[in-house]
């Protein structure tokens, strides 16, 4: 197990920003270095304790899916070794947890695909009979499989804020407003890119879910992010089908009517729900057993899905 990394301190490259989990550095005008830390957030608050190997799991799993799904849509990978773009004394910080990626313009939406009625979708369905405005058959139970996957985009929120579900029409409007000016002469436009993102996201989800089913895992839902290059070509960016962006259930314990256990930070959420805490920063420290169980769940998800061991 590698030494946990809460925050990278790369000095040889300019720091562009830090998200909930990832630190972003400029390599040059065309490329970025993405360092995936071991930070963990819950209820949109970054907690003070890192989860050992979490960043390595997320990076290895994303790389696995980028390779497996690359025939569906281009992705952000450059193939450049992250250790080659930092100083020699910084290589330990990036080893196994970093990617050198193309510098692309992100679409201003989260591309969420749902295959099951769970989470906020279950609450929405109970209240309205629909999820994000998409009408569904009556009488579905919690965690029921949908007749077919649905695309339910969300707005992108700043760190500490909540993403907001939006309609597909609103997603098209957002993409048109933010991207159309960048696409002059490219033969496409923002609204068309939103449609491309929807179609790509559903195709990615279906292929990944079919693969995962053969490994004994249900992918209940997932969130993709897309970006475009200067020619307006859509690329899969950020992370793909990790425990942070997806809801993974062990198939052998799945049944309708309950919220199944998942391969993610559920141990942390369950523990935090026992505290008198306002769910605002600063977050509380985690007990050692919660940290260990969460780390084990992340590693188990990677090993079961890929058939590989974390190097």
Swiss-Prot record:
Catalytic activity: 5-amino-1-(5-phospho-D-ribosyl)imidazole-4-carboxylate + L-aspartate + ATP = (2S)-2-[5-amino-1-(5-phospho-beta-D-ribosyl)imidazole-4-carboxamido]succinate + ADP + phosphate + 2 H(+)
EC number, as in UniProt: 6.3.2.6
SUPFAM superfamilies: SAICAR synthase-like
Keywords in alphabetical order: ATP-binding, Ligase, Nucleotide-binding, Purine biosynthesis
Record-linked Pfam families: SAICAR_synt
Matches recorded under PROSITE patterns: SAICAR_SYNTHETASE_1 (PS01057), SAICAR_SYNTHETASE_2 (PS01058)
GO biological process: 'de novo' IMP biosynthetic process
Domain of life: Bacteria
UniProt-recorded Gene Ontology molecular function terms: ATP binding; phosphoribosylaminoimidazolesuccinocarboxamide synthase activity
Biochemical pathway: Purine metabolism; IMP biosynthesis via de novo pathway; 5-amino-1-(5-phospho-D-ribosyl)imidazole-4-carboxamide from 5-amino-1-(5-phospho-D-ribosyl)imidazole-4-carboxylate: step 1/2
Gene Ontology CC: cytoplasm
Family indicated by similarity: Belongs to the SAICAR synthetase family.
Database matches in NCBIfam families: PRK13961.1, purC
Protein name per the record: Phosphoribosylaminoimidazole-succinocarboxamide synthase
Organism of this sequence: Aromatoleum aromaticum (strain DSM 19018 / LMG 30748 / EbN1)
